[in-house]
Swiss-Prot record:
Binding locations of (2E)-4-hydroxy-3-methylbut-2-enyl diphosphate: 40, 75, 125, 157, 215-217, 258
Protein name: 4-hydroxy-3-methylbut-2-enyl diphosphate reductase
Organism name: Pseudothermotoga lettingae (strain ATCC BAA-301 / DSM 14385 / NBRC 107922 / TMO)
Cofactor binding note: Binds 1 [4Fe-4S] cluster per subunit.
Biological classification of the source: Bacteria, Thermotogati, Thermotogota, Thermotogae, Thermotogales
Cofactors named for this entry: [4Fe-4S] cluster
Reaction catalysed by this enzyme: isopentenyl diphosphate + 2 oxidized [2Fe-2S]-[ferredoxin] + H2O = (2E)-4-hydroxy-3-methylbut-2-enyl diphosphate + 2 reduced [2Fe-2S]-[ferredoxin] + 2 H(+); dimethylallyl diphosphate + 2 oxidized [2Fe-2S]-[ferredoxin] + H2O = (2E)-4-hydroxy-3-methylbut-2-enyl diphosphate + 2 reduced [2Fe-2S]-[ferredoxin] + 2 H(+)
Annotated pathway: Isoprenoid biosynthesis; dimethylallyl diphosphate biosynthesis; dimethylallyl diphosphate from (2E)-4-hydroxy-3-methylbutenyl diphosphate: step 1/1; Isoprenoid biosynthesis; isopentenyl diphosphate biosynthesis via DXP pathway; isopentenyl diphosphate from 1-deoxy-D-xylulose 5-phosphate: step 6/6
Length: 278
């Protein structure tokens, strides 16, 4: 049995930055909260919780907020929400990914120039909820809309680059616009992983994608790989024990952007142990 591991695995730069800022805060403060899970990875979140980092859900303010630090995750939040939280917490640590922040700023600037902002994305995704705080009348959709006037089409940073291009083509073909701007705001790192996952999936009998069940980019990689081979998404290395490896000679492995590289090594070790037991 041969294993092909993607070259680009583990945390992306945005997640790595967010975790580094969080760990620095642990060393300086006793009471720390994150607004939602700092990353879509149960193991990492549990590890931080053991070190005193508690997860807050939206609209819940703890009694000790005045003496606590609040960490804004990489998905970002709206400016209004940030302003309100600054009034309540002792300190705000904003770990919004620079790529996501650029999307917010670009959308806001172009909207002020008189364009209608259309974003290819999932309206329920935290990143898109935050964008709404910058451009309240932005259209966020997965289905190409019929548009008119001056339009700017952008994308949620974690969407599939191929699906974004398809969305753009279909939007143009069915719209009556006077002017259109298209800005590719898909994260280059996730786009690169997408292409690599596709390349590996074409060579293997089974593709294993490691990442959180609620991770948008991990789900996207699983969807892409499944077009070419059998693909299984796992959240923890322990789930390897549930996989059927019968008639599998080639295995591909990749990860979502919130998955630590150590998980890949553990998964490989478990696969090798399974093989040796046969």
């Amino acid at each position: 049995m041969r294993i092909i591991v993607a070259e680009d695995i583990g945390f992306c730069s945005g997640v790595r930055r967010a975790l580094k800022m969080t760990l620095s805060e642990i060393n300086e403060n006793e009471k720390i909260y994150t607004l939602g899970e700092i990353v879509h990875n149960k193991t990492v979140v549990d590890s931080l919780r053991k070190r005193g980092v508690n997860v807050l859900q939206e609209n819940i303010i703890p009694e000790d907020a005045k003496n606590s630090s609040l960490i804004i995750r990489a998905h970002g939040i709206s400016r209004d929400q940030l302003f309100e939280l600054q009034k309540v917490f002792k300190k705000i640590v904003d770990t919004t990914c620079p790529i996501v922040h650029n999307l917010f700023q670009t959308a806001s600037r172009i909207h002020q120039e008189g364009y209608r902002i259309v974003v290819f994305g999932k309206e329920s995704h935290p990143e898109m909820s935050a964008l709404k705080g910058y451009v309240k009348d932005a259209t966020i959709t997965l289905k190409p809309p019929e548009l008119s006037g001056r339009i700017c089409i952008m994308s949620q940073t974690t969407m599939s680059i191929d699906e974004f291009y398809d969305f753009v083509v279909k939007s143009i073909s069915q719209s009556k616009f006077s002017e259109i701007r298209i800005i590719n705001t898909v994260c280059e790192i996730t786009a690169r992983r997408e292409k690599e996952a596709q390349k590996i999936a074409k060579q293997v009998d089974l593709m294993i994608i490691i990442g959180g069940k609620n991770s948008s980019n991990t789900s996207k990689l699983t969807k892409i790989a499944s077009k070419f081979t059998r693909a299984i998404q796992i959240e923890t290395p322990e789930e390897v024990d549930k996989i059927n490896f019968d008639k599998v000679e080639m295995i591909g492995i990749t990860t979502g952007t919130s998955t630590p590289e150590e998980d890949v090594k553990t998964v490989i070790d478990k696969i090798k142990c399974r093989r040796e037991r046969k």
